[in-house]
């Protein structure tokens, strides 16, 4: 049996098609009598309007596309949760697409979401090329970049001040009596690695301390383990007592190396990470780290995007900077 159409509803209700449309969209006043006839006809026919067709007419789908690098990454899942929960409060549904770091997949995701008539796009990725940015701008759909520190002009975001937070982390070690503090970053530099190094270097320079920066091959726990021998060698030669790592994973990998080589943490070295990932809470010793408010970043970001979609106040005229939190655990001690 064929699905009923808006024409069938109008015929049964004894009104015009435009009257049915006004009732469905609540766009213009309709008399109570006509409204009742239309609603009765809709219920009798079990009429379900084609949402895509309605969205094309009204230019309103109540859909927001979220492109994520990898939903399996813990903090990205927290960002998505903030986006989704606040989006639902504003009556928006989320369409999720994963790219796994592939630029072609990211381009395809943008094209796919455009065909779904999304009203806005959130991109959650650590690395976005200038070419992708051009594609987003050309698409004419309001968009928001999260988890991407960049120097693109006139594209604001919600974030923490990574330079300030790394500065405060090194300051915490200094206040515990550590004066020889090393920093482990990544060989492959990007905007984020550079601002974290700047935070470390700023405190070191302000306090006339000696800088020691070591580069790991990557940001996994295996990379932290593999850099262990080099870190210990340099730490011994420079009398280092505390080491700050780019993230929690490399810090925990290094601690694992120490455990395998009869080096005690924090007795021999104080170790700190960055991110407050689950691994920092379950590994022993529990890791001193910096907690990033990822849920709040996602929640504020989606609220800003929805306001932009609706033509309301732009709450992201400048970057919205949130405070992170130092979480002191068992991997550090006073020197």
Identify the function of each model-found stretch.
Residues 1-4, 59-171, 175, 233:
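Alpha-helical recognition/docking segments in bacterial nutrient-uptake
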Residues 1-61, 75:
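N-terminal helix-turn-helix DNA-binding module of bacterial transcription factors
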Residues 16, 62, 119, 178-180, ...:
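Short acidic/polar active-site loop segments enriched in Thr and Asp
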Residues 45, 115-117, 176, 234-239, ...:
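Glycine-rich phosphate-binding loop signature in dinucleotide/nucleotide-binding domains
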Residues 68-78, 96-105, 148, 158-168, ...:
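Hinge/beta->alpha junction and helix N-cap segments in small-molecule ligand-binding domains
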Residues 89-90, 139, 204-210, 235-238, ...:
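Short helix-capping segments at alpha-helix termini
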Residues 233-242, 246-335:
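Flexible loop/turn connectors
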């Amino acid at each position: 049996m064929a699905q009923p159409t808006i024409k069938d509803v109008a015929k049964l209700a004894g009104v015009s098609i435009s009257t049915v449309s006004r009732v469905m969209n609540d766009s213009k006043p309709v008399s109570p009598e006509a409204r009742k006839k239309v609603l009765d006809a809709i219920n009798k026919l079990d009429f379900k309007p084609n949402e895509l067709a309605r969205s094309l007419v009204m230019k309103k789908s109540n859909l927001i596309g979220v492109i994520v690098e990898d939903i399996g990454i813990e903090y990205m899942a927290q960002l998505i949760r903030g986006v989704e929960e606040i989006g639902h409060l504003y009556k928006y549904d989320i369409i999720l697409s994963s790219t796994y770091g592939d630029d072609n997949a990211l381009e395809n995701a943008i094209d796919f979401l455009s065909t779904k008539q999304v009203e806005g796009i959130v991109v959650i990725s650590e690395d976005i090329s200038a070419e992708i940015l051009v594609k987003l701008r050309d698409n004419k759909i309001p968009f928001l970049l999260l988890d991407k520190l960049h120097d693109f002009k006139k594209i604001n975001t919600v974030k923490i001040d990574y330079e300030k937070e790394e500065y405060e982390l090194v300051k915490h070690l200094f206040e515990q009596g550590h004066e020889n503090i090393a920093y482990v970053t990544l060989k492959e530099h990007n905007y984020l690695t550079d601002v974290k190094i700047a935070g470390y270097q700023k405190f070191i320079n302000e306090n006339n301390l000696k800088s020691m920066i070591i580069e790991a091959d990557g940001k996994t726990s295996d990379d932290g383990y593999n850099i262990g021998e080099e870190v210990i060698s340099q730490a011994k030669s420079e009398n280092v007592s505390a080491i700050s790592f780019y993230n929690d994973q490399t810090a925990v990998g290094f601690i694992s190396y120490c455990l395998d080589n009869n080096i005690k943490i924090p007795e021999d070295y104080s170790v700190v990470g960055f991110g407050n990932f689950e691994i920092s809470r379950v590994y022993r010793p529990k890791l001193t780290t910096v907690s990033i408010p990822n849920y709040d970043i996602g929640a504020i970001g989606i609220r800003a995007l929805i306001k932009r979609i609706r033509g309301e106040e732009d709450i992201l005229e400048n970057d919205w900077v949130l405070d992170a939190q130092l979480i002191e655990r068992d991997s550090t001690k006073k020197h």
